[in-house]
A protein has these predicted regions:
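Well-ordered alpha/beta subsegment
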Residues: 52-60
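N-terminal intrinsically disordered, cationic/polar leader segments
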Residues: 1-45, 49, 61-87, 91-98
Length: 98
C-alpha cells in the first residue's frame, strides 16, 4: 500500500469510528448502533491533531478529505449535543419569572 493510500485509510478509519460513536452506523463487531459523544469528541481531536501535524506535507486531495471529515463530524456532533440538551430540558420543570 502506498503512503497516500495509508493516509486515506487512516482518515477513513477515524471517520467510520466517529460515525459509529455518533450512533449513525452500526458497530461492525456487535451489529448494534451505539452513541458515545465523548468518543466522537476524541475522534475529532485526533483528526484535528493529525491535520495540524501533517500541514504542508499532504496533497490537496488528502487535505480536502481530512477537512471534510472533520467538518462533517463536528456538524453532526453539535446536532447530537443539541438533541441531548433538548431531551434533558424536557425532564426539567419550567422556571417561572418572578
Amino acid at each position: 500500500m502506498e503512503k497516500e493510500q495509508v493516509f486515506v485509510f487512516i482518515i477513513t478509519f477515524f471517520s467510520e469510528w466517529g460515525w459509529q460513536a455518533l450512533g449513525k452506523i452500526a458497530n461492525p463487531v456487535t451489529g448494534k448502533v451505539e452513541k458515545n459523544l465523548d468518543m466522537v469528541q476524541q475522534v475529532i481531536d485526533i483528526l484535528e491533531t493529525l491535520r495540524e501535524k501533517t500541514k504542508g506535507n499532504i496533497t490537496g486531495e488528502e487535505k480536502h478529505l481530512l477537512d471534510s471529515v472533520i467538518a462533517d463530524l463536528q456538524l453532526n456532533y453539535v446536532e447530537e449535543i443539541k438533541k441531548e440538551d433538548k431531551k434533558d430540558d424536557k425532564g426539567k420543570p419550567e422556571e417561572k419569572a418572578g
